[in-house]
């Protein structure tokens, strides 16, 4: 029984082998005929993918192109703002002609109350010129060429301005060398008073030029203007420099000066108050005296044993060169010795303003004698040893 089984299995395996060879040959023939067509199709698909992969739009990717606003768009927004302003004035029962931006802000805060802490997230109604940023006009012609020769620097207005300032400096140096050759150069240099004005800050300069500047660009521009201002420039150059300065209101004009009072004997005095931390002081400075200072009825040298605290009290008189010319009576309460000395110094400096000139008041303000110290003791934090100090860390 074993031999027929072997022969039958061999016949079956032989038939399977012949069928497999035939099917493989047929497949190879079909592959040879279809291979060129498949290769061309695959190549075309690869090329198609290669050329179309870059034009597939990406989702949820913000565009880096800056949004532009046309003049017609801005005009339309201004018209809508004026119409909304009239409606808002009528709703609030106000006159639309005298309805200012402060009234608009007050009305918006009343009609749309918001508890958001971030003020920029609250509803606003501003003029379109404040909402939409300023933009440049078209900088190139119909042929695609830019109008300005510094267009490809990326900051044409900035570099054009730097070129103008440097050209002025070269002209001034040339003029000075010409005068020096003829011995006509003046010996005295003219000093220009720049008190009461400041340079444009970086954001203001960017708004003027409608360009983004780095900190280095801003510093180089200010340094060049300062060099031009310190040189012997004329009226035209000085007027050019003033375009980049803004006037500042002097604090001395806002400083409240205590009026001079008179006691029963007819002696003039001035009274003022001061505070530092939790200490509060009141000082009476007499117009004439020998330099005696009493604190709570005690001489200041006995009340303040530390030399540093005594120097704090004497500094306002030393600053305006009036040591030994005024008598002072002070009362102070609260705080420690250092805080009490600071409160008394502030009170005496404010009272002393009644007997000095306006220029000396401004000098005292710039020295910080008329400014209240806002610093207070920082609170202890939970989980810490102090306000800033942490507990000692131990591994075990």
Swiss-Prot record:
Gene that produces this protein: MRPS9
UniProt name for this protein: Small ribosomal subunit protein uS9m
Family membership: Belongs to the universal ribosomal protein uS9 family.
Domain of life: Eukaryota
SUPFAM superfamilies: Ribosomal protein S5 domain 2-like
Gene Ontology molecular functions: RNA binding; structural constituent of ribosome
Record field: transmembrane: none
Taxonomic lineage: Eukaryota, Metazoa, Chordata, Craniata, Vertebrata
Keywords annotated in UniProt: Acetylation, Mitochondrion, Ribonucleoprotein, Ribosomal protein, Transit peptide
Subunit description: Component of the mitochondrial small ribosomal subunit (mt-SSU). Mature mammalian 55S mitochondrial ribosomes consist of a small (28S) and a large (39S) subunit. The 28S small subunit contains a 12S ribosomal RNA (12S mt-rRNA) and 30 different proteins. The 39S large subunit contains a 16S rRNA (16S mt-rRNA), a copy of mitochondrial valine transfer RNA (mt-tRNA(Val)), which plays an integral structural role, and 52 different proteins.
Chief localization: mitochondrion
GO annotation, biological process: mitochondrial translation
Organism in which the protein naturally occurs: Homo sapiens (Human)
Residue numbers bearing the N6-acetyllysine modification: 287
Pfam families: Ribosomal_S9 (PF00380)
């Amino acid at each position: 029984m074993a031999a027929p089984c072997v022969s039958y299995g061999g016949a079956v395996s032989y038939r399977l082998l012949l069928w497999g060879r035939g099917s493989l040959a047929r497949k190879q023939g079909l592959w040879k005929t279809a291979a060129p067509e498949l290769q061309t199709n695959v190549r075309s698909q690869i090329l198609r993918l290669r050329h179309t992969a870059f034009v597939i739009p990406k989702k949820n990717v913000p565009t880096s192109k800056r949004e532009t606003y046309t003049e017609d768009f801005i005009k339309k927004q201004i018209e809508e703002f004026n119409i909304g302003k009239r409606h808002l004035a009528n709703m609030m029962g106000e006159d639309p002609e005298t309805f200012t931006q402060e009234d608009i802000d007050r009305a918006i805060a009343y009609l749309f109350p918001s508890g958001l802490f971030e003020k920029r997230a609250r509803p606003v109604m501003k003029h379109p010129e404040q909402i939409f940023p300023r933009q440049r006009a078209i900088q190139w012609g119909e042929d695609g060429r830019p109008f300005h020769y510094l267009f490809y620097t990326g900051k044409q207005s900035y570099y054009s301005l730097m070129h103008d300032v440097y050209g002025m400096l070269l002209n001034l140096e040339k003029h000075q060398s010409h005068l020096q050759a003829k011995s006509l150069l003046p010996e005295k240099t003219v000093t220009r008073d720049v008190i009461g004005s400041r340079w444009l800050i970086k954001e203001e300069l960017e708004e003027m030029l409608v360009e983004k500047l780095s900190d280095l660009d801003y510093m180089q521009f200010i340094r060049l203007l300062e060099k031009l201002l310190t040189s012997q420039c004329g009226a035209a150059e000085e007027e050019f420099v003033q375009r980049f300065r803004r006037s500042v209101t002097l604090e001395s004009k806002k400083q409240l000066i205590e009026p001079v009072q008179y006691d029963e004997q007819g002696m003039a005095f001035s009274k003022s108050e001061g505070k530092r931390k939790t200490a509060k002081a009141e000082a009476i400075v007499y117009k004439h005296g020998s330099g005696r200072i009493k604190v709570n009825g005690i001489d200041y040298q006995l009340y303040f044993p530390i030399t540093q605290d005594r120097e704090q009290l004497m500094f306002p008189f030393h600053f305006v060169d009036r040591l030994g010319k005024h008598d002072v009576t002070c009362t102070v309460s609260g705080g420690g010795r250092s805080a009490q000395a600071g409160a008394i110094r502030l009170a005496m400096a404010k009272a002393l303003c009644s007997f000095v000139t306006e220029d000396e008041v401004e000098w005292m303000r710039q020295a910080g004698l008329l400014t209240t110290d806002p610093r207070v003791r920082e609170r202890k934090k939970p989980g810490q040893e102090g306000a800033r100090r942490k507990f000692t860390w131990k591994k075990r």
